[in-house]
């Protein structure tokens, strides 16, 4: 018969091994004494399952920890952290996150201290697997209607982190009304956020149709329109074309503080020559306009070949 290891040593070691990612040794301790799955670590006052998912553990170890202590899936530490939420934040493997969901689907409806749902967290990480994201959405579709304490819905975060993917479109399909909701800090609509973070023309077009007024809305501090925000270093002609199509007058609008027109911004950021051409054609007089520091668009982009040409 296998003798149990020293219990005090086990209680100290299980969390240390998990933090050091010594998975095989942690598994051995768990097999020798499953009660270690109920011990509290000193670093985060957490159970071993929570400690493990912070460190990208293998699926087999997570399954063993859940089997030894099923309640650990729904147990928060003193900071309010739950294994599923922590696994998503730590970008654990798809298999590990899926195992946590299946062990306790109710956790999908949990909230963090900032008011974020699990779906909010899933929208924060570009590496999130689409099928897994869709599983979270199916378990709680109404999560798309919740906003965190900053006034951000999952759609805002999806536009921030997932513009090149289908996730932002999926969230928009689930709750298109969120396109008409601005955040509480900068009064940005999802259209502003998507424009700034490299959304393609198709997504911008869909956001516009869900709430056309967003294209004329200016952010609180700098007074940027979506077109200003789209004229960044990652701008694509398709995105700028869509924004100009629906609100060509935006090419004539300067920022509240710097007075820069979209052409100033695009020139400064070295945007594609096709983008510069579209902005010029929308407002030819922009070439002569100076911003608050006295620079014309040409002077803003003096270091970029595309502007010189």
Question: Which residues fall in each region the model found?
Answer:
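Core solenoid repeat modules with strong leucine/isoleucine-rich periodicity
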Residues: 110, 121, 126, 130-132, ...
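Ankyrin repeat boundary/linker residues
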Residues: 40-43, 76-77, 111-113, 147-148, ...
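Leucine-rich solenoid repeat scaffolds
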Residues: 280, 287-309
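Ankyrin repeat A-helix N-terminal signature
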Residues: 16-21, 51-58, 86-93, 121-129, ...
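Start-of-repeat signature of ankyrin repeats
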Residues: 10, 44-46, 80, 115, ...
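N-terminal segments that cap or nucleate solenoid repeat domains
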Residues: 3-57, 61
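A generic tandem-repeat structural signature
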Residues: 69-126
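Ankyrin repeat domain, specifically the short helix-to-loop turn at the C-terminus of the second helix
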Residues: 28-36, 63-73, 98-107, 134-144, ...
